[in-house]
Amino acid sequence: MPVADTSQPMSGQPVSAVAERYASSLFELAREAGSVDAVAGDLNRFQAMIDESVDLQRLVTSPAFTSEQQASAIAALCDKAEIGGLVGNFLKLVAANRRLFAVPGMIAAFRMIAARHRGELAADVTSAHALTPAQETELKEALKSATGKTVTMFVTVDPSLLGGLIVKIGSRQIDTSLRTKLSTLKLALKEVG
């Protein structure tokens, strides 16, 4: 289960129609090649690289870079990280098409499609602190009993939550973060005062 330690995770991006189409195409190619798990692993590693690097986040989101600059940088990153084959070519194509901004959504969509194909649900979990293996197991079991399906979790760490976690499964979100509770309390106090 991939874990990225970051104060500004990009993996929580909403999934757009563009991201869904790209992810669906990548999934079909991976399924035909029998490499869905390998592709998922490479995508998870690339997402962790995005989450951990402000420079890579800028490359992915900034329109200031040309498609040639983005494609060249992505090719170098893929070579260095040994992300080749299907995912390497996919990322280079996405860069050439000036769609790098949608990569986090594409990765999230791929995870959902792959989980659905396996009869599972994909859950994006953002925690204020790294979860222990026991906490991960307990959360996975709680989500399984709530949904009735096996759950694959993708965990990121966001210290700005202060405490608690945010769990996203499809269009549903459960936010038990201390940051949200404090914001709610602040609004309630403004209404009273």
Swiss-Prot record:
InterPro entries per record: ATP_synth_OSCP/delta_N_sf, ATPase_OSCP/d_CS, ATPase_OSCP/dsu
Its annotated function is as follows: F(1)F(0) ATP synthase produces ATP from ADP in the presence of a proton or sodium gradient. F-type ATPases consist of two structural domains, F(1) containing the extramembraneous catalytic core and F(0) containing the membrane proton channel, linked together by a central stalk and a peripheral stalk. During catalysis, ATP synthesis in the catalytic domain of F(1) is coupled via a rotary mechanism of the central stalk subunits to proton translocation. This protein is part of the stalk that links CF(0) to CF(1). It either transmits conformational changes from CF(0) to CF(1) or is implicated in proton conduction.
Q: Where in the cell is it found?
A: Cell inner membrane
Keywords, ordered alphabetically: ATP synthesis, Cell inner membrane, Cell membrane, CF(1), Hydrogen ion transport, Ion transport, Membrane, Transport
Q: Name one GO cellular component term.
A: proton-transporting ATP synthase complex
Cite the HAMAP family for this sequence.
ATP_synth_delta_bact
Source organism (scientific name) = Allorhizobium ampelinum (strain ATCC BAA-846 / DSM 112012 / S4) (Agrobacterium vitis (strain S4))
Q: Which family does it belong to?
A: Belongs to the ATPase delta chain family.
Transport among keywords: yes
Q: How does it sit in the membrane?
A: Peripheral membrane protein
Share what the entry says about its subunit structure, partners included: F-type ATPases have 2 components, F(1) - the catalytic core - and F(0) - the membrane proton channel. F(1) has five subunits: alpha(3), beta(3), gamma(1), delta(1), epsilon(1). F(0) has three main subunits: a(1), b(2) and c(10-14). The alpha and beta chains form an alternating ring which encloses part of the gamma chain. F(1) is attached to F(0) by a central stalk formed by the gamma and epsilon chains, while a peripheral stalk is formed by the delta and b chains.
Q: What is the lineage of its organism?
A: Bacteria, Pseudomonadati, Pseudomonadota, Alphaproteobacteria, Hyphomicrobiales
SUPFAM superfamilies per UniProt: N-terminal domain of the delta subunit of the F1F0-ATP synthase
Superkingdom assignment: Bacteria
Q: Which positions make up the signal peptide?
A: none
Query: What is the name listed in the Swiss-Prot or TrEMBL entry for this protein?
Result: ATP synthase subunit delta
Give one GO molecular function term: proton-transporting ATP synthase activity, rotational mechanism
Classify the main location.
membrane
